[in-house]
Curated annotation (Swiss-Prot):
InterPro entries: Homeodomain-like_sf, Myb-rel_proteinP/Y1_C, Myb_dom, Myb_TF_plants, SANT/Myb. One of its GO terms (biological process) is pigment biosynthetic process involved in pigment accumulation. It is found in: Nucleus. PROSITE patterns: HTH_MYB, MYB_LIKE. This is Transcription factor Y1. Disruption phenotype: Lack of this gene leads to loss of visible red pigments in pericarp of the seeds, glumes and mature leaves, all of which are white as a result. Leads to loss of flavan-4-ols production in developing seeds and loss of 3-deoxyanthocyanidins (3-DAs) in seeds at 24 days after anthesis (daa). A variegated pigmentation phenotype in seed pericarp and leaves is produced by an insertion of a transposon called candystripe1 (cs1) into this gene. Spontaneous excision of the transposon restores normal function of this gene. This gene has been successfully introduced to maize resulting in transgenic plants that show resistance to fungal pathogens C.graminicola and C.heterostrophus, which cause anthracnose leaf blight (ALB) and southern corn leaf blight, respectively, in this important cereal crop. The enhanced resistance of the maize plants is due to production of 3-deoxyanthocyanidin (3-DA) phytoalexins, specifically luteolinidin, and the higher levels of preformed flavonoids, especially flavan-4-ols, induced by this gene. Transmembrane segments: none annotated. The keyword DNA-binding applies. Keywords: DNA-binding, Flavonoid biosynthesis, Nucleus, Plant defense, Repeat, Transcription, Transcription regulation. It comes from the Eukaryota. Residues 9-61, 62-116 form the HTH myb-type domain. It comes from Sorghum bicolor. Residues 37-61, 89-112 bind DNA.
Length: 383
């Protein structure tokens, strides 16, 4: 992109202009005028580029070009205009009749800039020296592309911008950072177990990470005597040694606290629970059925354990006592009243132990205290 070259620059002469070339160019312009600089070298018979011919004519061969060295007054004016306009050499040259912009630019770069920026030379103009700036030239030159103002550098501007951006980011981070808040990482939940280590944590509303990401480096508390072990009620804390950095084991203490809090929440809820109410209702119905049964303790035990009403020992004693009682009732004895009275009064009956055992067995029932304890357990909510 851009402007097309003025010529092919093939076979053209380069370097310094000779006196013969200056004479040919001056004669052609005096006869035909400046015209088109692209066609001028070919028409004039010069082996030069059109741009080279234009610069040679404007900067050296023109009749109104002021020759000679730049005076001290002109230096002062150049310095003041450069401080105001910057590197806008065409606009500066318009205030010097007979001086070209190229000449002023070369003089600034070769003499004035070195003296000002290297040696810090101060130019003091005469009291009667005044600089008059033509405002019409300033307005007309605004349409052109001007140079940079003195003291301005793209590198310095970018460096200042980077510095300001970095400082603003630092200030924002300081404002948003809540500070290194120390928080107990291995403390017990109750007040009876004091914290044994402190860890630096981020915001409390941050999402959960993996177990490895939740591990934090903690510092031992020198005031605690058992700080080397690092074990607390909530979870173990392992460390390298008593003085080195400690690491909190990747155990999820939050789940335990959440489970306990869930149980507390269930116990403190006023609304009934569907499953729990169903179990309690079924158990209460079974207890009511047991109390509604019309049975003695033997029947109650048989119904409870699914066995006979009497145990095996009681059955054997009753079977042994029945034949003896039958024999005593069926044998005829004429002296039965006297013998019975005498036997009852004086002689021990040989069947007395069996009868006593049978009577004791008949009156033997399950332990009342055991049944009361069983009833209490049955009515309780242990099951």
């Amino acid at each position: 992109m851009g402007r097309a070259p003025c010529c092919d620059k093939v076979g053209l002469k380069r370097g310094r202009w000779t006196a013969e070339e200056d004479q040919i160019l001056a004669n052609y312009i005096a006869e035909h005028g400046e015209g088109s600089w692209r066609s001028l070298p070919k028409n004039a018979g010069l082996l030069r580029c059109g741009k080279s011919c234009r610069l040679r004519w404007i900067n050296y061969l023109r009749a109104d070009v002021k020759r000679g060295n730049i005076s001290k007054e002109e230096e002062d004016i150049i310095i003041k205009l450069h401080a105001t306009l910057g590197n806008r050499w065409s606009l500066i040259a318009s205030h010097f009749p007979g001086r070209t912009d190229n000449e002023i630019k070369n003089y600034w770069n070769s003499h004035l800039s070195r003296q000002i920026h290297t040696y810090r030379r101060k130019y003091t103009a005469a009291p009667d020296t005044t600089v008059i700036i033509d405002m019409s030239k300033l307005h007309s030159a605004e349409k052109r592309r001007g140079g940079r103002t003195p003291g301005w550098s793209p590198k310095s501007s970018s460096a200042n911008t980077t510095t300001n951006t970095t400082s603003s980011k630092t200030n924002k981070s300081k404002e948003t950072d809540p500070g290194p808040g120390l928080k107990s990482a291995c403390d017990a939940k109750g007040a009876s177990s004091p914290p044994t280590a402190a860890t630096t944590t981020s915001a409390a509303s941050s999402p959960r990470h993996s177990d490895g990401a939740r591990s934090a480096v903690v510092d031992p508390d020198p005031n605690q005597p058992n700080s080397s072990s690092g074990s607390t009620a909530e979870g173990p804390c392992s460390g390298e040694d008593a003085t080195g950095p400690w690491e909190l084991d990747p155990i999820d203490l939050g789940d335990l606290w959440e489970a306990e809090s869930e149980i507390d929440a269930l116990m403190s809820m006023d609304a009934p629970l569907e499953g729990f109410d169903a179990v309690v209702g079924e158990a209460q119905a079974q207890v009511d059925d047991l109390f509604d049964m019309d049975m003695d303790w033997d029947g109650f035990a048989a119904h409870l354990w699914g066995g006979p009403e009497q145990n095996d020992h009681i059955a054997e004693l009753q079977q042994a006592a029945e034949p003896q009682a039958t024999a005593a009732a069926c044998t005829p004895n004429e002296h039965e009243p006297q013998v019975a009275a005498a036997a009852a009064a004086c002689t021990p009956d040989e069947h007395e132990p069996q009868a006593a055992a049978a009577a004791a067995a008949a009156t033997c029932t399950p332990d009342e205290h055991g049944l009361e304890a069983f009833e209490t357990w049955l009515l309780s909510d242990s099951f």
